[in-house]
Amino acid sequence: MTTSWSDRLQNAADLPANMDGHALKKYRREAYHRVFVNRSLAMEKIKCFGFDMDYTLAVYKSPEYESLGFDLTVERLVSIGYPHELLNFVYDPAFPTRGLVFDTHYGNLLKVDAYGNLLVCAHGFNFLRGPETRDQYPNKFIQRDDTDRFYILNTLFNLPETYLLACLVDFFTNCDRYTSCETGFKDGDLFMSFRSMFQDVRDAVDWVHYKGSLKEKTLENLEKYVVKDGKLPLLLSRMNEVGKVFLVTNSDYKYTDKIMTYLFDFPHGPKPGSAHRPWQSYFDLILVDARKPLFFGEGTVLRQVDTVTGKLKIGTYTGPLQHGIVYSGGSSDTVCDLLGAKGKDILYIGDHIFGDILKSKKRQGWRTFLVIPELAQELHVWTDKSALFEELQSLDIFLAELYKHLDSSSNERPDISSIQRRIKKVTHDMDMCYGMMGSLFRSGSRQTLFASQVMRYADLYAASFINLLYYPFSYLFRAAHVLMPHESTVEHTHVDINEKESPMATRNRTSVDFKDSDYKRHQLTRSISEIKPPNLFPQAPQEITHCHDEDDDEEEEEEEVEEEEEEEE
C-alpha cells in the first residue's frame, strides 16, 4: 500500500529532501487568488476579523468613481474663483498612481523611494529629466519628514486630486495670461503660490466629501460606481463560524446602510438556496463615524445609533455588546473590550496604509491585511510582459561578461554605453506598461516609498480580501525569506574562506580552535574561582529558540493547554 504524501508529511520524521527523486516544488494558488505574506500569520490564532468599508468591503469602480470625484472638485474650485477653462479637463487614469509626493514649494509631483531619493519628477504634465531635476533637488533627494512642505498622496481617494494638481500646475505654467515663477505664478499684481493652490485643492476635496454631492451622486447610481461581489456574504458567513466579525468605518450610518444594503442585495443568503439575511446579521459589532486614525488612539465618545432615523442617541454607551446594535465613534480599545479580544487576536482588513494599517499595528498590535486593488494590474504586467524582465536579466549577464576577466590591475575600460542605453530603454518600456508614473511598487530596480510601507506595516496583502475564501482558516501564511544581495546572488556551493578570502576578513564566528578556547576558559576560571559567577560563558541553545517565522508563541500555547486541562479536571 502506497502512503500519500499528505499522510507522510504529518510526521516530521518522514519529511523528504525530494519526492521520489524529483525536487519538491511549492504549491501556489493562482496569482489572482493569492494572498501575499510579509510576516507569518497563523489563521487559526485569529479570533476576530475587522473590516473597513470604503475601498475594502465597498470597492469603488475605476475610473468612474475617480472621474466623479475629479469633476466635483473642479466644479468646487471654479465656484470659488478658479478659471472656468479648468472644466475642460477630463480625468485620465493613466497618469496618477498612489504614493506620490507633492512638493508644495516647487509644485512638483515626485515618486520617491523609502529614503527620499527621487525616482520620477513631474511638473504638471512635463516629466523632468536629470539636469532639470538637479536644478531644484541637487542631490535628487528630499527630506520626507518635512511634512509641512511634502505631502504624501497615499490613498485611493487621493487619485483624483493627484491628477488635478498636475492639471492645475500645467495649466497655470503654460497659459499665456499667467507668468510662471519658481514657487507659483502671477496674474498681474496677484501672486498664487503652489502651496496656497495645494491648500485650495485639499479644502475643495474635503468639501466635496463632507459637504458636497459626492455621496449623494454615488448612491443615485450604485451600479455604476460600486463593485458588487456575490462571494462577499459567503466569506463573511464562514468567518462568523470561526470567529467574530466587526466593521469600523469613518462614514456615517445612513451612507453606510445604503452601501452595505446594496453589497448584500442578493435573492439568497451566503449560499444559493439559503434565506436572504440583512447585512447587519453578518457582523458582531458595527462602528460608524470612527474618525480613523484618531480611532486607534484616544478615540471619541461611544454612542448608540438610532437605525430608524440615523441620529445618535443621547449619552455615552456603557453597556455590553449587543448584536444588531450600531454604534458611533469609540476607539480600538472599545473594540477589544466589547469583543473580549487582545491585539494579536484581531486581523484588521483595510485599504489605507496610514489610517487603517499603520495605526492599528503600531498602537494596538493588531494583525493587518492591506487591500491593494492595483495589484491585479501589477500582476498582469509582471506576467504578461515577462519578456521585458527577461531581457533586463540578459543585459545584466552581458554587462558581467564585459568585466569578467578584469581586476584592479586592468587599464582596459569596456564600452558599456550601448548596454546602459538598452537597460534604460527596456526599464522605461516596462514602467510605461503600468501607466505614466510607472509601477506602484517600483521604478526600475528601486522599490517605491509605497512598496516599503506595504512591506513594513502589512502582515498580509492582496488585490482583494475575497482571496481569503481560497484558504482554510487553519492556514499558516508563512513569510518567504527576504534575501539580501549577498544571499540572492551567491549560489549554495561550499567555499573554503580560509583559502579564498583576504586576511582582512577575520570575522569568523564558527570556525573556532576549541582546544585553545578551552585552555583559555580553564585559565580564566582558575583566576576568578573565588568569585564563582553563575555562568562564565554562553552556551549554544540546545532547544529551538531562534524561531520567528511561524507566528508561534509557545508560552501562550502551553498556558492554553494548561487551562484546558484544568477545565477538564
UniProtKB/Swiss-Prot annotation:
GO biological process: adenosine metabolic process; dGMP metabolic process; GMP metabolic process; IMP metabolic process
Keyword Signal set for record: no
This protein's UniProt keywords: Allosteric enzyme, ATP-binding, Cytoplasm, Hydrolase, Magnesium, Metal-binding, Nucleotide metabolism, Nucleotide-binding, Transferase
Documented EC number(s): 3.1.3.5, 3.1.3.99, 2.7.1.77
Cofactor note: Binds 1 Mg(2+) ion per subunit.
GO molecular function: 5'-nucleotidase activity; ATP binding; GMP 5'-nucleotidase activity; identical protein binding; IMP 5'-nucleotidase activity; metal ion binding; nucleoside phosphotransferase activity; XMP 5'-nucleosidase activity
Alphabetized Pfam families for the sequence: 5_nucleotid (PF05761)
Location of the region described as Required for tetramer assembly in the Swiss-Prot/TrEMBL record: 548-569
Protein known as: Cytosolic purine 5'-nucleotidase
Gene name of this polypeptide: NT5C2
